[in-house]
Amino acid sequence: NITRWLTIDVSPQRISDYVYTKALYPNSIPATQDDLQIEQALGREALRIAMSAAQKKLPDGVPTLKKNLLPSFEIILAGGSILSNAPTFGQSLLILLDALQPTGVNTLILDANNLLPALGAAAEINSILPVQALESGAFVNLATVVSPLSSSRYGTNILKASLRRADGSVSVVEVKQGGLEVLPLPIGQVTDLVLQPQHRADIGQGAGKKISMQVGGSALGLVLDGRGRPLDLISDEVRRRSLIKKWLWTLGG
């Protein structure tokens, strides 16, 4: 489960050694690119397992687009050293998308300064403080992510997104089943977004139902994740590693 997220060839023994070392020195940071990949792969699996366990304890009736997938949370606020120490926001976002596999439309925010534990403690004394911190810019708005649920064949168009900016310009992009697309939207801008599912894809309102909304700018903008839910990684190592590299490149490396 760990090696499937790697783009390099690493022996199981090397991974075990890294895990033992990390257990002994939890505050250590990756010294090489290989170590960084192993640590991020561990982070994906740890978060996936933790979320799976948490879902079993959620109350009945929490809305989901499909059984055993992440409920429709908005917003998703995440923190932790693996996310905050990632060299790029694109890597942080991809870890979250791979591990959580959200569906529908979600805003993903990163606690890059590890403020959440302190704010959680402070909330007992001042319940408004965490809200003020969220609005202060102390957290990084990573992206608005749209993840359609679709059973279409690989390569089929499943979603068309149109962004109308304040200057009147319009950006249009289509995402295919299995694809990952990005529409840049700088922080500070607010645009009108129209999402039109195709071939009965569902983004939260029902199969084929269009959504119109306003979205604000973020570090990575609008991300259209058509890779499928649940995310099914191909078994061929060479093709899988090439695909993961492509996803990283799409999100900025």
Model-predicted regions and their roles:
Residues 1-253:
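Helical "lid/coupling" subdomains associated with nucleotide-phosphate turnover
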